A protein has these predicted regions:
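Long, hydrophobic/aromatic N-terminal blocks
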Residues: 1-7, 76, 81
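DPxDG-like acidic metal-binding loop motif
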Residues: 2-31
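Glycine-rich, flexible loop/turn motifs
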Residues: 6-13, 51, 75, 149-150, ...
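Catalytic-loop motifs flanking and including active-site residues across diverse enzymes
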Residues: 15-16, 80, 126-130
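Buried hydrophobic packing segments
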Residues: 19-23, 40-44, 130, 134
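Surface "functional belts" at beta-alpha junctions
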Residues: 30-124, 153, 163
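Acyltransferase
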Residues: 119-165
Length: 165
């Protein structure tokens, strides 16, 4: 079995993990976890330029990662448009992809008009990417998720932030 381990909504990630962990424990079927951002970028791994995989995280923040030639240029993080721009090569074509990536792409073009930015109005099917990445993980004999592993949260929840105050 395979699931997106995040980033994503707190509730959605917890529900996915709870459901698949129950099946895993009942039937001894391993679970492989794949990054949501990696799934969005996967169809463009041969793109001649940089691929920014994003999810609008609200509050002027984005969950983002940058890839080039199937290599990670910027690790996944909860970040700002300015931080993402600092990792970009201004001499390369830049492709935006991901959930609601149009929001990010529009802001990127406005903030850094010198960049050669492209995006598509519709993205590929992330489910196909999810299964392709999982098949590769199995072929490469990568470890499935451990029993104690859970979602990948790049941001603290509102409740955690309230406790810190």
């Amino acid at each position: 079995m395979v699931l997106c381990k995040g980033p994503g909504t707190f509730t959605g990630l917890r529900l996915a993990f709870a459901a698949l962990k129950a099946i895993e424990l009942s039937f001894d079927i391993p679970i492989y976890g794949v990054s949501t951002l990696e799934c969005y970028a996967f169809p463009y791994k041969s793109f001649n330029g940089q691929v920014i995989s994003t999810i609008d995280a609200k509050k002027n923040q984005f969950f983002a990662a940058i890839y080039e030639n199937d290599k990670i240029i910027m690790e996944e993080q909860d970040t700002t448009i300015e931080t993402v721009i600092s990792f970009l090569d201004k001499n390369k074509c830049i492709l935006c992809t991901g959930y609601e990536s149009q929001t990010f792409c529009t802001l990127l073009k406005k903030t850094a008009p010198e960049l050669n930015v492209i995006s598509f109005s519709s993205a590929g099917n992330p489910c196909l990417s999810l299964f392709s990445i999982a098949e590769k993980m199995i072929e490469e004999k990568k470890e499935p998720l451990k029993d104690f592993e859970g979602p990948q949260y790049l941001r603290k929840s509102e409740a955690e932030l309230a406790l810190e105050k």
